[in-house]
Structures are given as structure tokens and as C-alpha cells.
């Protein structure tokens, strides 16, 4: 791949940060430390590239990132004038933590990742950053950290997993989640239940549908912070290896041209990222994370920007969880650049946005394959969309005065009016499914699990999967002040603001109340009189905080509401 920059370039020192330590004669102890890690005399004038991965053994999404990091370090070290230094930060496996109290730490991990990248690179004076994320919150955490530093940076996505298979049926992580509901209702044998569990995840790579990891990887490539094809190159592929080999030259180009995240992450670039989320049918979590990433670089993106773009952007990708295909299938027909090329041709993207190649988005995809709509149905043309407008809708009303996020594919309809069934937390809901408390026509209300109330705003993938598995996915709706996984589908509304513990009306809903959700007029309402609401509010007792010490308590104290991306650094 060729790298270039069309702007005017002044003479730039590649080591303008690291020279603070390596070239200062009053820093002898610092320089002794460098000799201690193996520096040679010639290394002291090189630009230092911090290479951070979220590698750890305990998650398929992340288990291979150390290997990719080593390959990237080799690429950097083979590039004249650069030296790579690896470091690591944490992650949380959403697939493992989902359904239990550990899931409260997932969103929190985004902030920990961002803070740790900023902290390490800021203290060590790295001249550039390469981040290698795998699981969901890894991606925005990496971008937020790099944006705060505002030094030449590239994100290398760890890549998507291959599908699993059992008895001739293709499987993925959501197959395992939904098998629980099938088991509860007696719709799957013990043998097949175990067979699904054993075969859903065949190895390394992020969850394979258009779930949160793949959604964000696609959004970030479109934003311009990854090399072309990074989001669609599978974890186990020659293309992913070749991508790592290119990083040395790519990061040197950014250093030479002094191209920083602030040059790339513009308002128009974020609009491109939101557009691709809609086109691919991506995760609701993109709303939270894109707002947070924009905040980190000083660009104002709000929920209403998502609605504005949703109104003019169709869903064209037939991807799981609501569709048929996985990210590996997109790779086979030309990857994300093929989609971007088509959207640019149709006038749906800002083609002049700068990217980490030093070229514009339009220049990056000039040689990409053209989508052939006659030979595949993974991606549809604009004239035959899966849904004429975006699937992510921002709903307001007395239940969500600060807004909420609905994921409406169109297959479940766009209007739901039903009877409330209230659950104070995730386990309460699962108990309700097992006891038969939920019936067709009900609106499940799961509350007290927002950013403050959770704390940490856990995902409700286990409840929505149980609902689908129990055969109620098309006849019930679910609303919450928590989040949803990218694997969630059905008639669902999350991110309700204000949340229950912050005075939101969702905290006052009672069983048998009528709730109306209108995704055409973008409203969500509790059909209870003002007098009754006032009476309930007068009698309301705020729940005792679930965390009083540690990182969860810190998050609850610092976080902004979901409508502002749950950022903690304002």
C-alpha cells in the first residue's frame, strides 16, 4: 500500500516527543534505563512508537493480539528511524461476563483502557501510537486514548472470528446465548444444548456478526483511523498478517507528515462513521462510543446526529443478529472498502476526509472491488434496501426525556403498545422467564442498571437472547436504562435517560401500566396520568448504591449520562 499526504508539509522531527528524554544531557538516569532495555547508541535518535495491545489469554477476541503486536513491532523496527516499544492494557470479555455482575465492568473498561494508554504514552513520551484491540470496548478505549494524546496513531483491529458449526448449522456466540431460552422452554435437548456450546466459538477473533466489535471496527476504519480492510480482514488470515507488516511504513508516513488524530477525526469523518453503522445494521453501542470518541477529540456529536443520519440512510447489509451473514462473508466480496466505494459513488459519504494512509477516504478505495449485486445478497443496492431508513432510532417522551436508543430492524414492526412487566435487574428478568411471568403483548422493563444504577450500564444480551429463545422475541418488547449487546435483536429500547436512580420515569413504572413505543414518530411513553406519576414520585425511595468503593463507585460518581456517551473525563 502506498502512503501519502496532499497537504503542505513543514520539516518535522520524528522524535519530537521522545527526544525530551533521549536527547537531554540532564537525564542520565533516563538514558541508563534505555541502555538497560537494550538500546544501542543509534536508537536514541529514533522516533519511539508505543505499540499497545489488549492481549490476554482469557478471551478468544484477544488471545492472538500479542502475536499481532510482535509482528507490528518487527515492522516498526525494520523501518528506518523508528523503534517500537510494546506495552499492554486490560480488557473485559463481554461474551464471558454477560449475564452476571461482572458485566458491570465492561463499559468501565473503555475508560480504563483510554486512561492507561494516555498515562503510559504520556509518561514515556512516545512519538506515535499503534493500538491493537480485539473485544468491544477495546476499540473506543483505544481511540479515546489516542485522541487525548493527539500524536500520530493507527488502530489495527484484531479481526473477526470464523463461524462455528454443529450438525450442519452455522453458529456464533449469539447461538449459545439463545440456546438458554430454548433450554428453558424445552425446545432443545441437553445433547444439542451442549453441542451448541462446544462449537459456537471455534478459535481466535471477535464475535462474528455485526455485533459491537465488528460494528466499531467498521466505524473506525470509515472514520479514517485504521488502514483499509482492517475491519473486515479476519483474525486468522494472510491479509491480517500483511496488514501488520505495513504498519511500520504507515506510522512513519504519519510522523513525517505530522498527521494527527485531530486532522482525521473531523465532524464529517464522524458522520461517515455513523453512516456505515446504519448501512451495516450495526450495534446500538455505536451511539455511546462514537459520542465518546468525538468528545475526546473536541468534536460535538450528539444522539440527534444519529437520528438525522438514520433518517436518510438505509440498511443495506444483511448481517447477524437480525440477518443471515457474518463479517467473514463481507471479507469474501471485497471487504469494507467495497462498501465504502459503492456509498461514495452514490453520494452517501464525505470522500475528502483524510485517513491514516495520508490519503483521502475516496483515494483509499479507488482500487477496491465493485459490489456485484447479482452474485451476492450480503450487501444490497440502495434501490432494494433491507430497511429504507436506519435501524437505530432516538426516541423521546415522558419515559425518556433525555432520549433513548431503539434498534428497529423493521422485521419486528415499528409500533408496540403493551403491558408493563417490571424487573429490577437482569436476574429478576431471567427468573421471570423461567416462571412464565412474561407473555405475548408485554413490555419487559429492566431498570436500575444504568451508568449510575448498575453501576456501569451492563448489557442485556442474556435477557434478550432468553426472550428470543423462549419464542417471545416477536411478541414482546424490552426497554431498559441499561445497554444492549450488538448481538441483541427484537423490539428493544435502551440507553433511557434519565435512568431510574437519577429520577427517570422508568423508576416509577409498575406492572400492568401501558407503554407505547412508536419508532415512526420516535416516541416512548408511559400511559399513566400526571397525577398518578406525581403520587408515585412522592413515595419513591432511591435504591441503595450497589458500589461504594473501587472502580465501579468511581465510574458511578464521574460518568455522564448515556446520551453524552458515559464519558468520565469532562
Curated annotation (Swiss-Prot):
Top-level EC class: lyase
Chain positions with N6-carboxylysine modification: 137
Reactions listed under catalytic activity: (2R)-2,3-dihydroxy-3-methylbutanoate = 3-methyl-2-oxobutanoate + H2O; (2R,3R)-2,3-dihydroxy-3-methylpentanoate = (S)-3-methyl-2-oxopentanoate + H2O
PROSITE patterns: ILVD_EDD_1, ILVD_EDD_2
Single GO biological process annotation from the record: L-valine biosynthetic process
Magnesium in keyword set: yes
UniProt KW keywords: 2Fe-2S, Amino-acid biosynthesis, Branched-chain amino acid biosynthesis, Iron, Iron-sulfur, Lyase, Magnesium, Metal-binding
Family: Belongs to the IlvD/Edd family.
Protein name per the record: Dihydroxy-acid dehydratase
Annotated gene: ilvD
